[in-house]
Amino acid sequence: RFEKKIHLPLIALIFIGIWLLSQIVFIGIYWDAPQYSDASNFQKWALDCYQKGCWYPRAEQFQSEPYICYAGYINFLIAYLHIFDTFKFVPIINLLLNSLQLFALYHISKKICNPAIAHYFVILYCILFSNISIVVPTTSDLFFTTFLFCSIALIREKHLFLLLSGLLIAYANYIRPFTILFLLPIFFYVLYHKFNWKYYISYFCGIGIMTLLLILFNYRINGTTNIVATTSGINLIIGANDDINGTYTNKVFQKGKIGYIENPSEYNVFQKDSIYMSRSIGWIKENPGKYILYTPVKMARLWWA
């Protein structure tokens, strides 16, 4: 077979080696570099809570902040600061997470397809620039996807594995509330492979246990049972405004622009999210062509990271 003639596993290993070395070079170049945009905010919120001896979000932040952002990741950073007292080593943590994610994705593609496809996948993963540069910033993306794909990789007809899978995917949702998009494909997968109904119980027990623990934790630190981010509206409005350029721009939040909210302290984060969402949808309805036109630009910027 073709993949045997070209020693596909060996080629995949070579690409992994180059990929790991490239990440180490990036870490060296950007070691302790200042963070920007979301990464800067994550560090700011985590450091603030760490210095005040609390967890995120605090009760007052539901009123003072424009949104509540990915508490699962920020609380990880707070715990990390309790150990290292500096953000310098976050890229090393990211390198470990990225390696774990690649292993999980290799396992998933091997299980769904075959070893040859899994090796091709590894090669494609390693040449994607964003999968190299992602180790540098302090962002939630890699943390979220590692939990998510490790959860999916654990899905098999073993009660303990399914319990762990449920725990991981529930925490992944605490990091970024997007796991609902993956639950339906997971359901079809286990349905296709005719899992016994008892395995469903193990999986949903894991989800239920972790969700309950997170709700109790959140109630203890700020008196609310909300465990998801309120970023849907603000994320949408960043890509749905007259100054759209395919990436983040703060022009949208300047006075007179669609993202500007008069007297923001009068609204809590849920109300602000609703305002951003309704304005975004209204703009998209009025400018569907412009919104669609920038999709390729967004994809290109995402690839380049």
Predicted regions and their residues:
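Extracytosolic helix-loop segments that constitute the early lumenal/periplasmic catalytic or substrate-binding loops
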Residues: 24-26, 38-65, 72, 242-255
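Membrane-interface transmembrane helices that cradle and orient dolichyl/undecaprenyl
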Residues: 110-115, 149-164, 172, 190-195
